[in-house]
Amino acid sequence: MSKTLLMPNDRATFALGQWLGERLVAGTVLLMMGDLGAGKTTLTKGIGRGLNIPDEIDSPTFTLINEYDSGRLPLYHVDLYRLEGAESDRLFLESYWEGIEYPPGIVAIEWAERLRYLPPEPLKIALAHHPKAVRQVTLTPSSPAQTCLVKALTTDAILADEI
């Protein structure tokens, strides 16, 4: 079961991220896919706001991983744009989602299509430009809890604070 939403502007994409950040549980891995400028970082900034992280959320394009631990849950923001194939294996990302070396939190992976193997039960988020809106966001859950979360998600719910 997937759900697709049309986001009328960047604020709506941010609001979707905030809505998710307020509801996600520790150990959630978000696999974000989409072209340049599709809104992956904007969505992650909203997630940070929803997690009550006071720090500015920046794209880790050059650092590869940014860690934020001052919110309701830690946020591990990963950007695989500059990596290819086996290079992502060397980041040992499983140490983030397994909660062994790092406290369990939210792992948000941009350019997740570059991963060679997927974590268990990720929430897949595909972002794309759309002719009738700024972007289209499709969420595909892989666990019962994520399915409940996605079912509860409506454009009206996330845009309520924008009106």
What kind of region is each of these model predictions?
Residues 37:
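Walker A (P-loop) phosphate-binding loop of P-loop NTPases
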Residues 30-32:
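Hydrophobic anchor at the beta1->P-loop junction of P-loop NTPases
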Residues 56, 61, 67-110:
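Conserved nucleotide-sensing/catalytic segment adjacent to the nucleotide-binding pocket
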Residues 40:
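Conserved lysine of the Walker
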Residues 1-19:
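N-terminal pre-Walker A segment at the start of P-loop NTPase domains
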Residues 21-27:
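Phosphate-binding P-loop
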Residues 3, 86, 92-163:
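Short phosphate-coordinating micro-motif centered on Lys-Gly-acidic
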